[in-house]
Structure formats: structure tokens, C-alpha cells
């Protein structure tokens, strides 16, 4: 049996990307955003095809993503933030709940979400990861937006094939 293969597609032309950035740990989050926006531009996503909103912290990110997803105006979304471990259990709570919320929104609304919420032990670790993570999120958002379109077309072709089979009967 011969199997098909879908090449990853990093062409961002015409894609609409929504970005939700947490403001807590703002210098780190600003670096994430700058790297993400620069990479989106390199991939062909126009500035007017992006919408950036900011929220207080990582726990507020999922709700903003949900509202963007509900609008149906975005091909992909990006979550940006930084959770730095402190001396209390709060780190685990924020890390786990923000991640679970982001995943749930993507699955509930069938929209790709690149999760760029850094979870690190120190500010130095966060700063060391901002450029690469911001860039990677842009690439993941574009690639997954294109993949969803390609996979949705499989469903459309499957429906057409089923109709053709019914017509043949």
C-alpha cells in the first residue's frame, strides 16, 4: 500500500494569526513577542493580518484565546508568557492550568494554538529561551494553520467521494 505524505508548509501569506501575550514577567514576554512577530513577517504573514492582545498573566491567556477562537477570524493563535518558579506551589498551578486551558481551547474550537508560555526556574533561563521559543511559535502556528486546511480538504474530498458512490448506485 502506498502512503501519502504532507510536506510542512511554512507559507504564511494570507493567514490571520492572533497572539495573546501575558504581561507578567513583561521583559521576557516582550522578547517572546518580538521574536514571534519577526518570524511571522519572514514567513509572509502581513502585519495587518495579526492581532495582538495582552492580558495580566498566564492564567488569563486561555480566555482571551477562546474569545479569539470564537470569532472565527483566525487561522491560528499563539500564546506567549513566562511563568518563573517561586517558593510556593503557585508555579505548578499556573503552569498546569494555563497549559490545560490553551490545549482545551484549541481542541474545542478546532484552531491551532502554538503554546509559547515558558515555564522555567529562573529569569535567566527565561531570557535564554525567548528568541528561539518566539520564533518556534510563529513557525508552529503557520505550519499548523496550513496543515488544518490540508486535512480539512481530505474531509471534503471524502464527502465528494461518498456522493459519487451514491450516484453510481
UniProtKB/Swiss-Prot annotation:
Its EC number is 2.5.1.78. The active site is at residue 90. 5-amino-6-(D-ribitylamino)uracil binds at residues 24, 58-60, 82-84, 115. Keywords: Riboflavin biosynthesis, Transferase. It comes from the Bacteria. GO terms for molecular function: 6,7-dimethyl-8-ribityllumazine synthase activity. It catalyses: (2S)-2-hydroxy-3-oxobutyl phosphate + 5-amino-6-(D-ribitylamino)uracil = 6,7-dimethyl-8-(1-D-ribityl)lumazine + phosphate + 2 H2O + H(+). Transmembrane segments: none annotated. One of its GO terms (cellular component) is riboflavin synthase complex. (2S)-2-hydroxy-3-oxobutyl phosphate binds at residues 87-88, 129. Pfam families: DMRL_synthase. Pathway: Cofactor biosynthesis; riboflavin biosynthesis; riboflavin from 2-hydroxy-3-oxobutyl phosphate and 5-amino-6-(D-ribitylamino)uracil: step 1/2. GO terms for biological process: riboflavin biosynthetic process. PANTHER family: 6,7-DIMETHYL-8-RIBITYLLUMAZINE SYNTHASE, 6,7-DIMETHYL-8-RIBITYLLUMAZINE SYNTHASE DMRL SYNTHASE LUMAZINE SYNTHASE. Catalyzes the formation of 6,7-dimethyl-8-ribityllumazine by condensation of 5-amino-6-(D-ribitylamino)uracil with 3,4-dihydroxy-2-butanone 4-phosphate. This is the penultimate step in the biosynthesis of riboflavin. Belongs to the DMRL synthase family. This is 6,7-dimethyl-8-ribityllumazine synthase. It comes from Cupriavidus metallidurans (strain ATCC 43123 / DSM 2839 / NBRC 102507 / CH34). The gene is ribH.
